[in-house]
Amino acid sequence: MSVRISFVGKGGTGKTTLSAILIDFLIHKNKIPILAVDADPNFNLNELLGIEVETTLSEVRESLLKSDVPDFISRYEYTEMKVHQILVENKYFDLLVMGYPETSGCYCPVHSFLSTALEKLMRAYSYIVIDNEAGMEHISRLNLTEMEHLIIVSDASIRGIFTAGRIADLIKNLKIKAENIWLVVNLCPEDQKNELEKYAKEIIKEKKEIKFLGFLPQDTDLLKYELKKIPVFEWKSKLKSSAYELFEKLFD
């Protein structure tokens, strides 16, 4: 059974960066093979992993909706074949990019084919890392709703921490079953930790299903890595080493 770890939070909190660092962490710990899933329509996880993406799952979805399926193959077999074709393969991990949201049309049968194909695909991996959009629509529609760890990422603000509480409510409403729901406050200045910790404890007291994973520091090196397009595997940064320490808690 695969271990599924999903990151969620409002835009700009660093979900994608932490997803990439977790993939690097898992490889470092020899916890492979890994399937990375970029479920954000504004996908860029591939950039942090140093790989290019040519096709997304949304293009498979649209071809199914238009019935662009050859006569000699069933719709499910076609779906399964296309899902494998759009995988970006790597030595230790593969990447699947969901792509843009639906346009108008009836997608219920399409979602059924895709969710069945994805479930079968995921059984081939020991670890699944999902970088979500804020509303988690993709994983909800495709029934990817059971996971071991769901990590809510907040920025270093009171408003961000309270938004994490609302995301916890959304998780319930979408019937997502997570064995562990964690809160991490990302890119936090050292002198704001004590103040923000009070609000984090307040949310955790109110939303008893949430556990506090910890704070992650600001890191001026991130911009340098981004500008030079250096993949996460080559980073030597304070954020990366601190994230490694937090991720150890997930696998105690």
Residue ranges and their predicted role:
Residues 133, 147-165, 190-192:
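Conserved Switch II/interswitch segment of TRAFAC-class P-loop GTPases
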Residues 4-41:
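Walker A/P-loop phosphate-binding motif and the immediately C-terminal alpha-helix
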Residues 120-124, 139-158:
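Inter-motif core of Ras-like GTPase G domains
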Residues 79-89, 94-132:
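Cytosolic-facing regulatory segments adjacent to core modules
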Residues 172-252:
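C-terminal lobe/tail of nucleotide-utilizing enzymes
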Residues 41-42, 101-103, 134-135, 157-159, ...:
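Conserved nucleotide-binding/hydrolysis micro-motifs of P-loop NTPases
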Residues 28-90:
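N-terminal phosphate/diphosphate-binding loop that engages ATP/GTP or pyrophosphate donors
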